[in-house]
Curated annotation (Swiss-Prot):
This is Beta-glucanase. The gene is licB. PANTHER family: XYLOGLUCAN ENDOTRANSGLUCOSYLASE/HYDROLASE PROTEIN 8-RELATED. It comes from Acetivibrio thermocellus (Hungateiclostridium thermocellum). Residues 246-265 are annotated as: Disordered. CDD domains: Dockerin_I (cd14256), GH16_lichenase (cd02175). Keywords: Glycosidase, Hydrolase, Signal. Its EC number is 3.2.1.73. Residues 267-334 form the Dockerin domain.
Length: 334
């Protein structure tokens, strides 16, 4: 957040975090992940993630509701909408990991919400609710101008490290990758595989949870602009990655969109394109899952062999796994 806003609201925010959020979390031994972690948001994985069901108060003019975190077509969707009969005028979604993550490279593929007065985010956080100091690293999109991303971080409650990066595109129009590499003496921020900013002062040290949320501001019009009450608004997320050893091969996911494989023979059907639209993307992944669950008995393409992505003569879960690895860029082609 803006330093000028934090200076005015720090005390109330800390009080709300400790009084309101803490009761919803029981103190447990922290599980810190130290191996590569990839989450593709095709469905709700309650073993790894949780949907918030409380209110932060202070500058957050909404209550978090599990109903506002949904999954469709290979995406996790956070929806900001009206809340009737409650203590807050709006409800929205927050999704957070159950485990903690420390130094390493973090990446998300997402599409931000666009509207004055709101924030779409990807960040790590720990604080009083986890019996830890407040340490946080943020990538935020202010809905009033989604051609920019705001980077920030906190160490032991001290922020004021905001940097506003001009993206060169509108983050609300398409999916792009955003990431940061967190090390003891610096944080490097990435956009579509390119390092765009390095921070070196007051670097946080405490492992935190991976979080995403969408919220309307209250009392921070100078920062976000005055929210006009427009609903519904959505931020969408395709995946999250974490690599403790840093940026994979010194090059995070470089491509802002999922490009289809190009067959050697252009007359051959495109492997993995099970819906026949000429592209291989999350819609094919969702359709493939329905086939394996026997919700459908065939794919809507003439040549069913497009689903045999590993070319072993069978269509099974091995093909789905390979398709998933392609979509998260773990393999370059099918």
């Amino acid at each position: 957040m803006k330093n000028r806003v934090i200076s005015l609201l720090m005390a109330s925010l800390l009080l709300v975090l400790s009084v309101i959020v803490a009761p919803f979390y029981k103190a447990e031994a922290a599980t810190v992940v130290n191996t590569p972690f990839v989450a593709v948001f095709s469905n709700f994985d309650s073993s790894q993630w949780e949907k918030a069901d409380w209110a932060n108060g202070s500058v957050f003019n909404c209550v978090w509701k599990p109903s506002q975190v949904t999954f469709s077509n290979g995406k996790m969707i956070l929806t900001l909408d009206r809340e009737y009969g409650g203590s807050y005028p709006y409800k929205s979604g927050e999704y957070r990991s159950k485990s903690f993550f420390g130094y390493g490279y973090y990446e998300v593929r997402m599409k931000a919400a666009k509207n004055v007065g709101i924030v779409s985010s990807f960040f790590t956080y720990t604080g009083p609710s986890d019996n830890n100091p407040w340490d946080e690293i943020d990538i935020e999109f202010l809905g009033k101008d989604t051609t920019k991303a705001q980077f920030n971080w906190y160490k032991n409650e001290v922020g004021g490290n905001e940097y506003l990066h001009n993206l060169g595109f509108d983050a609300s129009q398409d999916f792009h990758t955003y990431g940061f590499e967190w090390r003891p003496d610096y944080i490097d921020f990435y956009v579509d595989g390119k390092k765009v900013y390095r921070g070196t002062r007051n670097i946080p040290v405490t492992p935190g949870k991976i979080m995403m949320n969408l919220w309307p501001g209250k009392g921070v019009d100078e920062w976000l602009g005055r929210y006009d009450g427009r609903t519904p608004l959505q931020a969408e997320y395709e995946y999250v990655k974490y690599y403790p050893n840093g940026v994979p091969q010194d090059n995070p996911t470089p491509t802002p969109t999922i490009a289809p494989s190009t067959p050697t023979n252009p007359n051959l059907p495109l492997k993995g394109d099970v819906n026949g639209d000429g592209h291989v993307n999350s819609s094919d992944y969702s359709l493939f899952k329905r086939y394996l669950l026997r919700v459908i008995d065939r794919f809507p393409v003439g040549d069913q062999s497009v689903a045999d992505v590993n070319r072993d003569g069978r269509i099974d879960s091995t093909d789905l796994t390979m398709l998933k690895r392609y979509l998260i860029r773990a393999i370059p082609s099918l």
